[in-house]
Structure formats: structure tokens, C-alpha cells
């Protein structure tokens, strides 16, 4: 009971195969395929991590440098405690911690502490508009950044890679759209991928669907994404196609990542062994 799905696999020898099912949406019978553009949500994070590691490779930053030296705004993001109070962080934050989800930044849907601190819309499960103030750290998704533990002391899936996107912009002097296009998408020939894509691609975009918590029925979700973004969230704002994203993955599998970066090896082995019961 889903409108569409595209499955694909890539191998080291360059082989790819895709299987597609369904139509563009529950309201549009246009067939989908490997060239259909989607909003790829958190699959954006792997691209942002690659961009960050390119800057490590260039010597602009080291994985374990305190980022507050280049991004002092991090000092202002306090730790949200279980009783709802805030306190100052004890430790500086590193790029490694932002990329491996040990920085303390969380999403409202991964942290009960944050979920309790904001009001959620019962119809969507997302924060109400008044709970999503504009901020200068990490735009585009969820709530104003909160940390729930000190950097390096635990693990939680969250907004750290999005914050890393802000660091990339600060270090490179370019916005994420410009940087990733020039340094990742164009070198790999990913012509149907970007934060801002052509109007032709926007017209082909597969819309999101929502399932009613009351009836279980699917419907096309309102498109809240502007046709052109002015600010770019490294944790989830990219548009891409299955074929383009497979090109990115094949690059990593074949070792062609060396043409984009060498520091990928620094994050290829596990960087988090265990926290708590993990």
C-alpha cells in the first residue's frame, strides 16, 4: 500500500540494476524509474560528510579540532537536561563528533527530552510552527538546535551532520549548494542532484505522502519545500534520483572516492564502539 518504490543495487565492478514499481503519486499515474527525482531526506548526510572530509583532506580543519575556534556559535548551544533546564557544555565539539552522532545534537523524534520541550502537532507529529523559530545554526528541519549531552559522552541520531554543513560553509566560504555542486556532483556527473535543481526536475519530483493516523489512508502531503532554497540544510535538503545516488555510492565502493577525498578512510572504520546499551 505505497504509491511507488525504486530498488537498485551497485557493485564494485560498476554494475547497476534498478527495479521500479508504481506511479509518481496516488494522484498522478506517471510511471516512476531510476531517473525520477526524489527529496532524499537524510541520504543527504552522506554527501555532507563527504564534503566535510574534503575539507579535512585540504587541511582546512582536522577531525578532532575544537570547532568553536572557527564556529564560535557552538558555545551558545546549551545542554537540555531531563528536568527541562539548560546548562553550559563542558567540552568543545569536533567535526568527528558531528559526523558520527556523538555531539549531543538530537531530533525531537529521537529524543524524548526534546519532544517534551516542544509542542507537537497531533495531526502530523511535527512541532507546531511557533515551536520552530528561525535560527542561525541549522536551518530546514525540526526545532532550534538543542543538545542533550556533552560532546563525546553518548550517541544519538540527530542534527549533527546538519551543523557540520554550517561548518563547511564557514570554512569554504561557499554555501552548501555551490560547494557540493562544484566538488561532488559535477565531478561525478550527477546532473540531476542538488539543493536547487531545474524547474524541469521540480515538475517531475515525486511528492511525499502522509498516512492518516485515524484512517490509515495515504494522501499527497502539502509541498512545504520552496522551489528555490536560499539556505541549505546538510542533513536532509537534497533532491536526487536513484540513478544519480547510485553513482555516488558506486564511487565509494570502487575506491574512486580517492578522486574526491582520501580522508574517507578516517571515517570508514567504526568510530563509535559502544555507548550505554548500544
Descriptions of predicted regions:
Residues 13-14, 39-67, 161-169, 245:
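Active-site SXXK
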Residues 18, 78-278:
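Short, surface-exposed loop or secondary-structure junction motifs
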Residues 4, 62-69, 175-179:
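Alpha-helix N-cap and coil->helix boundary residues
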Residues 68-77:
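Acidic helix-start/capping segments at beta-turn-to-alpha-helix junctions
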Amino acid at each position: 500500500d505505497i504509491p511507488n518504490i525504486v530498488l537498485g543495487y551497485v557493485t564494485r565492478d560498476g554494475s547497476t540494476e534498478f527495479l521500479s514499481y508504481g506511479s509518481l503519486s496516488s494522484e498522478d499515474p506517471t510511471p516512476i524509474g531510476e531517473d525520477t527525482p526524489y527529496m532524499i531526506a537524510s541520504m543527504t548526510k552522506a554527501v555532507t560528510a563527504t564534503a566535510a572530509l574534503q575539507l579535512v583532506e585540504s587541511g582546512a580543519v582536522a577531525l578532532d579540532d575544537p570547532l568553536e575556534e572557527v564556529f564560535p556559535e557552538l558555545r551558545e548551544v546549551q545542554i537540555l537536561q531531563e528536568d527541562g533546564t539548560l546548562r553550559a557544555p563542558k567540552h568543545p565539539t569536533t567535526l568527528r563528533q558531528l559526523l558520527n552522532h556523538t555531539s549531543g545534537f538530537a531530533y525531537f523524534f529521537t529524543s524524548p527530552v526534546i519532544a517534551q520541550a516542544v509542542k507537537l502537532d497531533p495531526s502530523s507529529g511535527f512541532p507546531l510552527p511557533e515551536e520552530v523559530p528561525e535560527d542561525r545554526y541549522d536551518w530546514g528541519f525540526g526545532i532550534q538546535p538543542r543538545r542533550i549531552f556533552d560532546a563525546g559522552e553518548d550517541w544519538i541520531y540527530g542534527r549533527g551532520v546538519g551543523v557540520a554543513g554550517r561548518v563547511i560553509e564557514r570554512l569554504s566560504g561557499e554555501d552548501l549548494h555551490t560547494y557540493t555542486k562544484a566538488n561532488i556532483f559535477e565531478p561525478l556527473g550527477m546532473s540531476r542532484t542538488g539543493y536547487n535543481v531545474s524547474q524541469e526536475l521540480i515538475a517531475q519530483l515525486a511528492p511525499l505522502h502522509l498516512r492518516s493516523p485515524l484512517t490509515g489512508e495515504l494522501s499527497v502531503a502539502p509541498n512545504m519545500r520552496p522551489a528555490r532554497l536560499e539556505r541549505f540544510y546538510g542533513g536532509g535538503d537534497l533532491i536526487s534520483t536513484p540513478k544519480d545516488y547510485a553513482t555516488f555510492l558506486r564511487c565509494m565502493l570502487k575506491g574512486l572516492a580517492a578522486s574526491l577525498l582520501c580522508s574517507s578512510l578516517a571515517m570508514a572504520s567504526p568510530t563509535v564502539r559502544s555507548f550505554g546499551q548500544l
